[in-house]
Amino acid sequence: ERLDREYNQTIITTVPNVEYQVHKTDGTMVLVDNPSQMPPLGNIDYITEPYIKAQIITPTDYMGNIMKLANDRRGIFISTNYLSTSKVDLIFEFPLSEIIFDFHDKMKSLSKGYASLDYEFIDYRKSDLVKLDILLNNEPVDALSSIVHRSNSFEYGRKLCTKLKQLIPRQMFEIVIQGAIGAKIIS
């Protein structure tokens, strides 16, 4: 609101995305930072995503909660270093896409504000990623599409469809809300 009022700038809020490297079956590679740019599933050989090395410093009382959060976000545990009897330094490797959305907020919430996060880019790694399309009345809605790990796709699609069901006002006709990967309906 302030940006609009003071600088006459309108803002569009979107979900944060990272840049994926999509290696196609013809040997070429394209950079994709938006699900709408994803090539058809049959043309994809493999996809790589950016990984980061994260250093999380937290009181030892919250270490278990932070470890669970990291595990839920596909974190790869590297090491633990006790800085004192009450503070621990945890090192993880994460896909960047797993921490850019709400990881920091959840980490702060789980540690009552005491944990801190620092990270740096490592490299791109091969991952089992898919494009999740949200269909309304069998028509894909590009703004709701996302690139997710296959292991999280069903749960993420179900949550998104349930949320849409709650948000879309009732109509005189039925609106079908579905999540799909390629031609396969998953939710």
Residue ranges and their predicted role:
Residues 1-187:
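Accessory interaction regions appended to the cores of large information-processing enzymes
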